[in-house]
Amino acid sequence: MSEQSGDPKVLLEHVTKALVDTPDQVSVEAIEEDGETVYELTVAESDLGKVIGKSGRTARALRMLLSAAGVKAGKRFALEILE
């Protein structure tokens, strides 16, 4: 990966780009609020279903990855998937 391989934003971006058909439209914005970092994930409308997954399983897995990265970093991370 890159020299920032421990960065949750880079991890989330990398994993999401591997899931979607239009990786050039994936963007991740990190916002600090109330002692936690919220990552806002934006993808192409046609890829939204792939990112959410059946019954929300893929979205749940992405949130678990962020949670694990948060534990490792000693911080709280949250994920919002924007339409």
What are these model-derived regions, one by one?
Residues I52-G56:
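Glycine-centered tight-turn and secondary-structure capping sites
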